[in-house]
Amino acid sequence: MRLQFGELNITPRVVNRLHELDFTVPELEDAIADHKSSCDGEPSVYVGTYGKYNDGSLCGLWIDLSSFDDYDEFINFCKAIYADEEDPELMAQDFECFPRQWYNEGFMDEDDFNHILEYSEMCDKHGDEAVDDYMEYYDDFDNFDEAYCGEWDSEEDFARSIVEDCYDIEKSMGSLANYFDYAAFARDLFMWDYNMGAHNHVFRRL
């Protein structure tokens, strides 16, 4: 059976092992088609095994993590594509489209898997750049909606929007409003109350 790189040789022992994992050979072929990643923006890992790697083989498959309902389904599938090994020691040889903090060559645990799926859902909802900026300052997504303010060209532009939305400085200062120091105000805002990420998305500090 062809993987992306290398093959799973179907022998009677492999068929028996697949049966233990609740797969038939045709079902595994269908599952490979369903879970194989196109590496086109979906969170993915390239899964091999330490046994094959130590034997000089890069046999493996790019797998779309978002195509699974849960961690157990993912692990079971990974074991199935290496049913020619009695107890495959899974190896994540590369990754794409999720933060490095959840990548582990020695393989991810269930918490990391769930974080990656949540990250993917947040990116679909809010956009990759906004979510990546948020991740610069927060470890989980619990406070995204409360913290997110929007996107601005610069910290000073954000400061201007705060002044325009919250203060009528022309009324209170008259012509002196032309001399208001937006740059200094922005420095104060982002020193204490706000963060701006690399893609110019602003988040309130909570």
Which ranges hold each PLM region?
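Ribonuclease/tRNase effector modules and their secretory precursors
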Residues: M1-D40
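Ordered hydrophobic segments in well-structured contexts
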Residues: P43-G48, G60-D64, E89-Q93, D193-L206
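Extracytoplasmic/secretory-pathway segments with low complexity and glycosylation-like composition
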Residues: H126-Y167, F203-L206
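N-terminal ordered "arm"
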Residues: C39-D84
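Residue-level signature of catalytic and energy-coupling elements of molecular machines
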Residues: L18, I63, D181
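Acidic, proline/glycine-rich low-complexity IDRs
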Residues: T49-K52, A159-L206
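Structured domain cores in non-transmembrane regions
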Residues: D69-D140
